[in-house]
Amino acid sequence: MTIETMLSEEKSQSSDNRNNGSIKVGISSGEVDLESREVFRTGDDVLDFRTVSWQRATIMFCKINFAMSILAIPQAISTVGAVGGSLILVGFTSLNVYTALILGDFRNRHPECHMLADMMGLIWGMVGRELVGVQIIVLQILITAGGVATTAVGLNALSNHSQCTVIFGLASAILVTACSSVRTFSKLGWITWFGMITFTVGVLVFTIAVTQQDRPAAASPTGDFDLGWTAIANPGFVVGMVSSANLFICTSGSSMFLPVISEMRRPQDYRKACLWAGLIVGMLYLVLSLVIYRYCGTWLSVPAFGSAGPLFKKISYGISLPGLIIGVGIYQHVAAKYAFVRLLRDSDHLQKNTFTHWGTWLGINFAFGTAAFIVAEAVPILNYLLGLAGALCAAPFSLIFPCLLWMYDFKGYRSGTLIQRAQYTIHVLIALIGLYMVAGTAYAVVVAIKMAFQSGTIARVFDCADNSGSV
C-alpha cells in the first residue's frame, strides 16, 4: 500500500470517527494494528531500524537542540537585555516543548507518518505534503550551512587562518556529510553521546574562561570601559526580531524528533524523552547564556567563542568542534533520511543492503552537503542563517503546523464545552504567533543581510578572508 493510499484512508477514517473532540484513529481500536502501519517493519529478513531506546532518544533530542545556537544566544540576549532575553527564551522554550508533544502524540496516533510532511498531507493532501517536504529540506540545509560556517570559523581560529576560509568551509562540509551518512539513528546515537559531551565541555570551558578575565577580550586592554550590561534593552525592530528569532530557533527542532520516533523501540516513550530533553536544554541555554552575558556584556563575538581571547578561543573550539560537527550532521541526516524514505518507501530497497539502497543514501547526503556548503559561503554569518531558518521554516514547523494538526484531530473542540473551546482558541493564538514570527523575522533578516553587505560585514561570497578574528 502506498503512502498516498494510507494517508487518504486515514483522513477519511479519522474524519468519520471524530466525535466532539474524541479521537479514534482509523477504525476501532479492536480492529486496527498501529504497529503494522509503522514506517520501519521488524523481522528477520530486513535491516532493523527500530533499535533506539528512550534514553538514547533523549540524548539525541538534546543534541539536536543544544548545538551552535549557544554561540549566538548570548549576542541575542545582549540585544534585548538580560530580563527581556530570559523571558523570551523561557517562553519560547516552553512553547516549543508543548508543540513538540503535540507532534509526537499526533505521529503516534498516525504511525504511518514518518515526517511532518506526511502529517500535513493528512490535512492538505499531496500538494501540501510535497510543499512541506521542500520546507523540511530547506530548513535542514540552512541550519547545516550555519554549522558549516561556524566550523570553518573554528578551523580558522585553530590554525591562525593557515588556509583560505573557503577551503575550511569545504572541509567542514565534508566532515558533516561523513557524519550524516551514518545510516541509522541507533548507530548515530553512539557518536551523539560523544558529541554532546565534547560540545558541552567546550562551552563550559569557554564560560569559565570569560568569568576569569579582568575584562572582555574585545574591550580596550587599558583604561575604563562600559560593559554594556542591561536588564531590558530597547532595540529597533529589525535587530530585535533577528535576536528573537535566534532565541526561538534554539529549541525549535521538534520536527526533527519525528523520524527518531519511527526508529524507537517503543514510540510510546517519546513524551518521556521529549520532556527530559526540553528541561535539560532549556536550563543549559538559560544559565550559560546569562553567565556569558554577565561577564562579556556587549563585547560579544558571533560565534561567542571569540569573546574568550585567543588562547581560550582555540581551546574551546578544539574541544567542541567534534560535537559541533556531529550535531550539524544530525540535521543533515534528518533531511537525507526524509528524502531517502520518500524515494524508496514501499520498495525492497528501503531496508535491504542493495546497490540502489546505498547509492540513493550516499547520493542524497552528498547533494545536501554540497548545497549547505554553497549557502554557507553565500551568507557566512551564523545569526543571519539561524534567523532565516527560523523565519522560513522553524516558525511554521514549531508553532503553526502543530496547532493545525491538533485542531485537525480535535475538530470537535471548536463547538464543544467551554473548556474545549478555550483549548481550541489557545491553539489558534499559538498559530497566529507563528504567523507573526514568519512575517516579522523574514523581513528583519532580509534587511539585516542587505545592511551587512552594504556595510562590508559580509564582503563578498566565497571570501577567503579570515572570519575568526585570529589575524
Curated annotation (Swiss-Prot):
Residues 1-24 are annotated as: Disordered. The chain crosses the membrane at residues 70-90, 131-151, 162-182, 190-210, 229-249, 273-293, 315-335, 362-382, 385-405, 429-449. Its main location: membrane. InterPro entries: AA_transpt_TM (IPR013057). Keywords: Glycoprotein, Membrane, Transmembrane, Transmembrane helix, Transport. Glycans are attached at N20, N160. One of its GO terms (cellular component) is membrane. Disruption phenotype: Does not affect 2-benzoxazolinone (BOA) degradation. It is found in: Membrane. GO terms for molecular function: L-amino acid transmembrane transporter activity. It comes from the Eukaryota. Pfam families: Aa_trans. Induction: Expression is induced in response to 2-benzoxazolinone (BOA) exposure. It is a multi-pass membrane protein. Belongs to the amino acid/polyamine transporter 2 family. Fusarium verticillioides possesses 2 unlinked loci, FDB1 and FDB2, necessary for detoxification of antimicrobial compounds produced by maize, including 2-benzoxazolinone (BOA). The FDB2 cluster arose as a duplication of the FDB1 cluster with rearrangement and expansion by incorporating additional genes. Transmembrane transporter; part of the Fusarium detoxification of benzoxazolinone cluster 1 (FDB1) involved in the degradation of benzoxazolinones produced by the host plant. Maize, wheat, and rye produce the 2 benzoxazinone phytoanticipins 2,4-dihy-droxy-7-methoxy-1,4-benzoxazin-3-one (DIMBOA) and 2,4-dihydroxy-1,4-benzoxazin-3-one (DIBOA) that, due to their inherent instability once released, spontaneously degrade to the more stable corresponding benzoxazolinones, 6-methoxy-2-benzoxazolinone (MBOA) and 2-benzoxazolinone (BOA), respectively. This is Transmembrane transporter FVEG_08292. It comes from Gibberella moniliformis (strain M3125 / FGSC 7600) (Maize ear and stalk rot fungus).
